[in-house]
Amino acid sequence: MSLDSIHHTIQAATNAFKEKLALHFDVSQTFLFGSMARHTEHAESDADVAVVLNGETGKFIDTKFAMDDLAYEVLLDTGVRIQPLPIWLNEWENPTGYPNPSLLFNIQREGLVL
């Protein structure tokens, strides 16, 4: 699947989210995954976005909450709910060391590069 196949509103929202992320985090890559990437979404679906971060592995909860705040700003601006998942580059490159390796393998297989 290609990014071109994503609905324009979702693409605009994920672009806005990426811009906000870049102001606060050292982002390596971002991926859309889940139902929107598979085109199985429904009216209440959110946009699952994996955010691969450079640098040392940080505190997941603190990072997740900070990204959630940015996603909320995007929700207010666009009406699109983004659910960010922070992943550090060393976890991305070595999924077996991640608490849920199958999730990372799934994102690597089905995710759309944003």
Residue ranges of each PLM-predicted region?
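Catalytic core of pol beta-like nucleotidyltransferases
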Residues: 1-28, 37-43, 54-114
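Short beta-strand->loop micro-motif that forms the acidic, two-metal-ion catalytic signature
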Residues: 47-52
